[in-house]
């Protein structure tokens, strides 16, 4: 299954390269890493909430308790639409967690390999600067849940008298989560409180990455575990660029972590080979496992 996904992605990249160069002028930060001052308890809590999106519906019922959070709403099936769960959390407020790729779903897999950069969706395009491009497949996946997600956020913010909104995602769900976080920030009252994204691939071009920094840079938390290969795709040679700052857990699945400032920092994850497997991508993030369909169901926080 992993080989099939890599082959599909390679074919997509080859098609893009044959279409001509995109943007090779994005910069790379040379700043040295700094000590981790991010809230690891919140990272652990967020990891548990996103793990539950991979669990069977029989274990995903409103009222389910995961750490300090209570499940209020769920939508999507992981096939034609990625699943998202909405929780009320003591630490995170209204927390929306978005599922990553379902390896048994062709539709889900195809979202990962539709690599052409496209304009932002018409519903939110006017909020972005001219020249913004995002990956087709990631945006397609987000748009399929967008209306249900926005309605649910607005409903439960009102019901719970809660202004804080936190967007969480893993893998494909992290890419969708970045688009969702920007959408909520740009179009909804109060915007987002934070976004926690695990194993985030590149989502857009340098214009997009710079706009993310401008709008939510102080609320953006990207976490990379060990030798995870997913944050290396789609490649920069195709015009894609990460926003600034990530937390790198190294060795993988440990609690040793540093923050790497700026966009595409030349230190950190770029200095080690990528592992051609999912062990670090589906790893342990500050004592909480994101194991996808092989992970704990119901999800547990802080027990690894």
Curated annotation (Swiss-Prot):
<keyword id="KW-0732">Signal</keyword>
<dbReference type="GO" id="GO:0005576">
    <property type="term" value="C:extracellular region"/>
</dbReference>
<keyword id="KW-0443">Lipid metabolism</keyword>
<dbReference type="InterPro" id="IPR029058">
    <property type="entry name" value="AB_hydrolase_fold"/>
</dbReference>
<feature type="signal peptide">
    <location>
        <begin position="1"/>
        <end position="19"/>
    </location>
</feature>
<dbReference type="Pfam" id="PF01764">
    <property type="entry name" value="Lipase_3"/>
</dbReference>
<feature type="glycosylation site" description="N-linked (GlcNAc...) asparagine">
    <location>
        <position position="102"/>
    </location>
</feature>
<feature type="glycosylation site" description="N-linked (GlcNAc...) asparagine">
    <location>
        <position position="253"/>
    </location>
</feature>
<keyword id="KW-0964">Secreted</keyword>
<feature type="active site">
    <location>
        <position position="281"/>
    </location>
</feature>
<dbReference type="GO" id="GO:0046872">
    <property type="term" value="F:metal ion binding"/>
</dbReference>
<keyword id="KW-0479">Metal-binding</keyword>
<dbReference type="GO" id="GO:0016787">
    <property type="term" value="F:hydrolase activity"/>
</dbReference>
<keyword id="KW-0325">Glycoprotein</keyword>
<feature type="active site" description="Nucleophile">
    <location>
        <position position="171"/>
    </location>
</feature>
<dbReference type="GO" id="GO:0016042">
    <property type="term" value="P:lipid catabolic process"/>
</dbReference>
<feature type="disulfide bond">
    <location>
        <begin position="55"/>
        <end position="297"/>
    </location>
</feature>
<comment type="function">
    <text>Secreted lipase involved in Dandruff and seborrheic dermatitis (D/SD) probably via lipase-mediated breakdown of sebaceous lipids and release of irritating free fatty acids. Shows activity against monoglyceride and diglyceride substrates and generates free oleic acid from the substrates mono- and diolein. Able to cleave the oleic acid from both the 1 and the 2 position of the glycerol backbone as 1,2 isomers of diolein were converted into oleic acid and glycerol. Can hydrolyze 4-nitrophenyl palmitate to release 4-nitrophenol and palmitoic acid.</text>
</comment>
<keyword id="KW-1015">Disulfide bond</keyword>
<keyword id="KW-0378">Hydrolase</keyword>
<keyword id="KW-0442">Lipid degradation</keyword>
<comment type="similarity">
    <text>Belongs to the AB hydrolase superfamily. Lipase family. Class 3 subfamily.</text>
</comment>
<dbReference type="InterPro" id="IPR002921">
    <property type="entry name" value="Fungal_lipase-type"/>
</dbReference>
<dbReference type="InterPro" id="IPR051218">
    <property type="entry name" value="Sec_MonoDiacylglyc_Lipase"/>
</dbReference>
<feature type="active site">
    <location>
        <position position="228"/>
    </location>
</feature>
<protein>
    <recommendedName>
        <fullName>Secreted mono- and diacylglycerol lipase LIP1</fullName>
        <ecNumber>3.1.1.-</ecNumber>
    </recommendedName>
</protein>
């Amino acid at each position: 299954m992993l080989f099939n996904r890599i082959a599909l992605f390679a074919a997509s990249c080859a098609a893009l390269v044959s279409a001509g160069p995109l943007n090779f002028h994005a910069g790379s930060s040379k700043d040295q890493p700094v000590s981790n001052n991010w809230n690891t308890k919140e990272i652990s809590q967020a990891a548990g909430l996103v793990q539950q999106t991979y669990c069977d519906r029989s274990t995903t019922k409103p009222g389910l308790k995961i750490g300090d959070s209570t499940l209020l709403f769920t939508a999507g099936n992981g096939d034609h639409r990625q699943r998202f769960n909405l929780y009320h959390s003591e630490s995170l407020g209204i927390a929306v967690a978005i599922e990553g790729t379902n390896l048994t779903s062709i539709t889900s897999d195809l979202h990962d390999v539709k690599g052409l950069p496209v304009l932002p969706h018409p519903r939110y395009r006017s909020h972005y600067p001219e020249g913004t491009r995002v990956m087709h497949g990631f945006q397609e996946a987000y748009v399929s849940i967008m209306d249900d997600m926005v309605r649910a956020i607005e409903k439960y913010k009102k019901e719970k008298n809660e202004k804080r909104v936190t967007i969480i995602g893993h893998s494909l769900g992290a890419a969708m989560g970045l688009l969702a976080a920007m959408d909520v920030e740009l179009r909804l009252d109060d915007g987002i409180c934070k976004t926690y994204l695990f194993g985030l691939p590149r989502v857009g071009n340098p214009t997009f990455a710079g706009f993310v920094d401008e709008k939510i840079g102080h609320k953006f938390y990207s976490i990379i575990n060990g030798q995870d290969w997913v944050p290396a795709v789609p490649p920069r040679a195709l015009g894609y660029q990460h926003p600034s700052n990530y937390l790198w857990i190294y060795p993988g699945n440990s609690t040793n972590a540093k923050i790497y400032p700026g966009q595409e920092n030349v230190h950190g994850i770029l200095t080690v080979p990528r592992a051609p497997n999912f062990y670090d991508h589906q790893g342990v993030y500050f004592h909480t496992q994101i194991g996808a369909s092989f992970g704990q169901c119901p999800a547990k926080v802080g027990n690894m």
